[in-house]
A protein has these predicted regions:
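Conserved catalytic submotifs in the C-terminal HATPase_c
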Residues: 1-4, 21, 26-37, 73
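Short alpha-helical segment within the cytosolic histidine kinase core of two-component systems
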Residues: 10-22
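Disordered, acidic interdomain junction associated with two-component signaling
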Residues: 22, 30, 75-80, 96, ...
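Short helix-loop "hinge" at the ATP-lid/N-box region of the Bergerat-fold HATPase_c
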Residues: 57-58
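Short conserved segment of the HATPase_c
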Residues: 93-107
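Short alpha-helical Gxxx[C/S/T] motif in the catalytic ATP-binding
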Residues: 117, 122, 126
């Protein structure tokens, strides 16, 4: 399925902006004009993963910002991959917490569940979706310094579609 990545990212940002505004957070979605805009893939799965990562970033950030950034990178075997990164100025995670993060029903600890809510399924589902699309997902984080969740996808570039004006 061909999809317009820029439009998809704008839709996601628009959907989550209300939550960010309620918490007085800055939600920054940096669309890279030098990269192709159209890709072949599953926009529904991409949307679900990004919505989950950005939603979590907003949930666990009390002040500051949540930034979505994407870029093309080269894999170790020379393939071009699209790498998405969601960075926040939130509570951050210890190495021990990071190790359990992508398991089902896992949250940083029980106090996190009480304070922030949620089932602990979001990251496990995101990991599964990313892997179904042939990608990888990971996190870099430090307690008190925020987190940076990333995932890579091997999406084929599609021909740009020009939509008729309605």
């Amino acid at each position: 399925l061909d999809f317009d990545l820029g439009t998809l990212l704008e839709d996601i940002a628009d959907t989550l902006a209300v939550r960010a505004i309620e918490k007085e957070l800055e939600l920054i979605c940096s669309v890279n004009p030098t990269l192709p805009q159209w890709y072949k893939g599953d926009p529904g799965r991409v949307r679900q993963v990004l919505t989950n990562l950005i939603g979590n970033a907003i949930k666990f950030t009390a002040q500051g910002e949540v930034v979505l950034h994407y870029e093309l990178i080269l894999s170790s075997d020379g393939r071009q991959l699209l790498r998405f990164t969601v960075t926040d100025t939130g509570i951050g995670l210890s190495k021990e917490q990071q190790a359990k993060l992508f398991q089902k029903f896992s949250q940083a600890d029980s106090s996190t569940t009480r304070e922030f809510g949620g089932t602990g399924l979001g990251l496990a589902i995101s990991k599964q979706l990313v892997e179904l699309m042939g990608g990888e997902i990971g996190v870099h984080s430090e307690p008190g310094k925020g987190s940076s969740f990333w995932f890579t996808l091997d999406l084929e570039i599609a021909e740009a579609k020009i939509e008729p004006i309605k």
